[in-house]
A protein has these predicted regions:
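Compact mixed alphabeta submodule
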Residues: 107-229
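Short acidic, low-complexity intrinsically disordered linear motifs used
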Residues: 74, 233-251
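OB-fold ssDNA-binding interfaces and closely related basic DNA-contact patches used
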Residues: 1-135, 203
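Intrinsic-disorder/low-complexity linker and hinge segments
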Residues: 14-21, 217-240
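Alpha-helix initiation and N-capping motif
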Residues: 3, 180, 202, 238-242
């Protein structure tokens, strides 16, 4: 028995369980949340991470999130400069996409503690615009911040290709919670986001890329060609890349 392999798999399962319980995803309809100050970076509650999606049916955290080299990103950028349309489309699939996270509590579910909400570019820009507005300012302030209404509409409900998330920052100022002990617990008992997403080494990501490019299959060439054609077709259909990534990331 390969004990190291067993330990690695156990760690993967524990990481997945830990992530699930510490992430929040809006459900269809309206919910109210509060964005909290982030314990591990009190100057900025928003955490920008980059991910490779859909490689070998998995999502991988890119080291470029932390300013470190990433072989998949390097390969994607080389493909972009090849002048070949199919390789350019493959590069778009391979390159890392940004997803922003913020620590939040959900109104009515405060007992569940702090969770991380991950959202796309549109929601991120709206939140930054509100905070930059002097009439609103720091919406995360423990005493005079503001709650945020989040509305999630499924693709079926909207008749669009992708689900839609919209936000409205409430005008009334209010504390995160009234109880001081509960407030302290919410501000101090926060995970570091890097505990939820495992960063693979340069060598491990190289193996991921090689597996994606050269799947262990008798029909390797046919499968790779099909993947490239699929990427081209999908890219032609996608008008809102951010919305598309939101849908894929949340599956």
């Amino acid at each position: 028995m390969d004990i190291n392999s067993i330990r690695k798999r156990l760690n993967q399962l524990q990481t997945t369980n830990n992530r699930t319980s510490n992430l929040w995803k809006p459900q269809p309809g309206k919910q109210v949340i509060r964005v909290l100050p982030y314990k591990h970076n009190k100057d900025n509650p928003f955490i920008e991470l980059f991910f490779h999606f859909g490689l070998n049916n998995k999502t991988y955290l890119s080291p470029i999130s932390f300013g470190r080299p990433d072989p998949i990103e390097e390969f994607a950028q080389k493909l972009k400069t090849s002048g070949n349309r199919e390789e350019y489309q493959m590069a778009r699939k391979l390159e890392a996409k940004m997803r922003t996270f913020a620590p939040v509590i959900v109104r009515g579910e405060e007992a569940q503690g702090v969770r991380f909400w991950g959202f796309g570019k549109t929601v991120y820009q709206e939140l930054l615009s509100v905070i930059a507005d002097p009439d609103y300012g720091d919406i995360t302030d423990a005493v005079s911040g503001r709650d945020v209404s989040v509305e999630f509409i499924t693709a079926e409900e909207s008749g669009a290709s992708f689900p839609k998330t919209s936000i409205r920052v409430r005008p009334n100022q209010n504390p995160i919670v009234e109880d001081k002990a509960q407030l302290e617990a919410l501000l101090e008992n926060q995970k570091d986001i890097t505990e939820l997403y495992q960063e693979l080494s340069y060598e491990e990501l190289t193996d991921v890329l090689n597996t994606w490019l050269n799947p262990d299959d008798a029909s390797t060439d046919e499968k790779t060609e099909t993947e490239v054609s699929s990427v081209v077709a999908e890219s032609a259909k996608v008008e809102d890349a951010s919305a598309a990534f939101d849908e894929l990331f949340n599956k």
